[in-house]
């Protein structure tokens, strides 16, 4: 079979959650599994993370998918609801909602629900995306407190905009704003994402929201080294993306390789054609020199990434054969490195894996 393969190590996924819980024993873990479990498979990840205290998803469709397969854990929908039909489904399926705009408050007031709703009030402390301003939040909180449609206490949350930056000034300001505005509010609090989890221990409050770190990937990329050793020691990559060599060619000096003739052989040399391309989710903008792992050794990508194939330099691997597995990222080759080479972030690479890729689960 020549399809690219994403091998998902569910044991590593469980291990990563246990590490998070051990590092924040006083907090409950709200596992972020939005965007198809960060590309790892929504249902697969939810079933593996049964020890999570709750799940976070982006939209109601993701939440309903989990309920349909029998996931009974609390689920919080980060974008909340947008009409009466959705709101009714929230109540029917026991979904928690993030309340971030006045339209949602109005819907709550005019809709008769069959059961009360668990909600989190989102306070915008500086992300300037979703949420009520610091100035608006006390009034909205008091308004929600009077609603018979809402379970008490009301959750209180914010989102950190710059927690992966070594300059802590803005994030510390956000945390200060949040603590100040919620000082007289009663309810569970949640502040940190994966980066905040490591960098801001003072913000490890009632609930933490680990995302990318669940999948064994640093939220800091490769440029922020303060937590590099800790992350590498305690967390394991969950996804390994691999593909097979489908052809080996001996090329002459100055022969060009791939579309656009952007790379030429510096000498007579062997190259391998690997069965993966941007049609599978491998980044088209990965440049020549981007590493892959073949038989435990690094080989460089050469030429442009095609829809279905890439070419790699085999000069360091004269014994490579058709059928050998090539690791594009994962165990032995962090996806953060590939993201850096391609000028993007690991999150994007994981979420762009396409349906053509075969997913395999292992326990290792």
UniProtKB/Swiss-Prot annotation:
EC code(s) of this entry: 5.1.1.1
GO biological process: D-alanine biosynthetic process
In-chain residues carrying the UniProt-annotated modification N6-(pyridoxal phosphate)lysine: 34
Catalytic residues identified in the record: 34 (proton acceptor), 259 (proton acceptor)
Pfam families, per database record: Ala_racemase_C, Ala_racemase_N
Homology family: Belongs to the alanine racemase family.
Cofactor: pyridoxal 5'-phosphate
UniProt protein name: Alanine racemase
InterPro entries found in the cross-reference section: Ala_racemase, Ala_racemase/Decarboxylase_C, Ala_racemase_C, Ala_racemase_N, PLP-binding_barrel
GO MF annotations in UniProt: alanine racemase activity; pyridoxal phosphate binding
Cellular component terms (Gene Ontology): cytosol
Pathway(s) of this molecule: Amino-acid biosynthesis; D-alanine biosynthesis; D-alanine from L-alanine: step 1/1
Protein task: Catalyzes the interconversion of L-alanine and D-alanine. May also act on other amino acids.
Binding site for substrate: 129, 307
Keywords assigned: Isomerase, Pyridoxal phosphate
Reactions mediated catalytically: L-alanine = D-alanine
Origin species: Coxiella burnetii (strain RSA 493 / Nine Mile phase I)
NCBIfam families per UniProt: alr
Transmembrane segments: none
Residue ranges the record marks as coiled coil: none
């Amino acid at each position: 079979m020549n399809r690219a393969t994403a091998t998902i190590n569910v044991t590593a996924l469980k291990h990563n959650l246990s590490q998070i819980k051990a590092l924040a024993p006083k907090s409950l873990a709200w596992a972020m599994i939005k965007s198809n479990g960060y590309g790892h498979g929504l249902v697969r990840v939810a079933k593996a993370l049964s020890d999570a205290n709750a799940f976070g998803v982006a939209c109601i469709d993701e939440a309903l998918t989990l309920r349909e397969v029998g996931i009974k854990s609390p689920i919080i929908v980060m974008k909340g609801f947008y009409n009466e039909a959705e709101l009714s489904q929230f109540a029917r399926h026991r979904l928690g909602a993030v309340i971030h705009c006045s339209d949602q408050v109005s819907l709550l007031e005019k809709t008769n629900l069959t059961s009360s709703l668990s909600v989190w009030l989102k306070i915008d402390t500086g992300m300037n995306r979703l949420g009520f301003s610091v100035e608006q939040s006390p009034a909205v909180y008091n308004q929600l407190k009077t609603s018979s449609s809402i379970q008490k206490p009301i959750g209180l949350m914010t989102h950190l905009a710059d927690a992966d930056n070594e300059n802590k000034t803005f994030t510390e300001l956000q945390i200060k704003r949040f603590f100040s505005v919620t000082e007289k509010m009663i309810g569970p609090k949640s502040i940190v994402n994966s980066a905040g989890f490591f960098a801001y221990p003072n913000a490890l409050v009632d609930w933490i929201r680990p995302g990318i770190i669940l999948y064994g990937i640093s939220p800091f990329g490769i440029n922020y080294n303060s937590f590099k050793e800790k992350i590498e020691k305690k967390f394991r990559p969950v996804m390994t993306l691999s593909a097979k060599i489908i052809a080996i060619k001996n090329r002459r000096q100055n022969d060009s390789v791939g579309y656009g003739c952007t790379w030429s052989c510096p000498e007579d040399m062997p190259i391998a054609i690997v069965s993966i391309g941007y049609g599978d989710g491998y980044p088209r903008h990965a440049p020549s020199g981007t590493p892959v792992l073949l038989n435990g050794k690094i080989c460089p990508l050469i030429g442009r990434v095609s829809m279905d194939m890439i070419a790699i330099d085999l000069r360091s691997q004269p014994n490579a054969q058709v059928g050998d597995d090539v690791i594009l990222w994962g165990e032995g080759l962090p996806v953060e490195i590939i993201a850096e080479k391609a000028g993007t972030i690991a999150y994007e690479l994981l979420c762009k894996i396409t349906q053509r890729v075969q997913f395999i689960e292992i326990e290792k």
